[in-house]
Amino acid sequence: MQPQLSRPQTATNQVRNSVSGPWSGNAAHKAEKYFITSAKRDRNDKLQIEIMPSSGRRKLSPTPEMIPKLIDGEIEIYVLTTQPDIAIDLGKQVIDMENRYVIDFDKRGVKWTMRDIPVFYREGKGLCVELDNRIYTLNEFFK
């Protein structure tokens, strides 16, 4: 039995082979999504990162094999702005960069939502994030 696509006119090259589900427009079907859950320094002041998939099933440490997958778009890595290990004061930067508000329709007011900052690979620098048109390596970004 052939897998059924949710959109019949979708070309075969628009569905990733590495993902089990059909393409549905949901980001979870396009790439594996990971979040940095912890970024601590060891005794030698080297950054130790712990990531977790969006499914929340297991904690991982980034491996060199993940870099090509990140570059090819097979996986996506994000840092939540609520992460306590961030060294940069994100308060004003995140609000200025993108006013992310959710209107609370049950008359309790406007609430600020957390934002996810994408992590990307830059040649010569390694894993990086960008805020206010400035690129930070993860080593600079975390305490």
Curated annotation (Swiss-Prot):
Q: Name one Pfam family in it.
A: RC-P840_PscD
Q: Where are the transmembrane segments?
A: none
Instruction: State the UniProt keywords alphabetically.
Output: Electron transport, Photosynthesis, Reaction center, Transport
Q: Does the keyword Transport apply?
A: yes
The signal peptide stretch is none
Segments carrying the region annotation (Disordered) are 1-25
> Per the UniProt entry, what are the Gene Ontology biological process annotations, in alphabetical order?
photosynthesis
The answer to whether keyword S-adenosyl-L-methionine applies is no
For bias kind Polar residues, which ranges apply? Answer: 1-23
Q: Which domain of life is it from?
A: Bacteria
Assembly and binders: Component of the P840 reaction center.
Name listed for the protein in its UniProt record: P840 reaction center 17 kDa protein
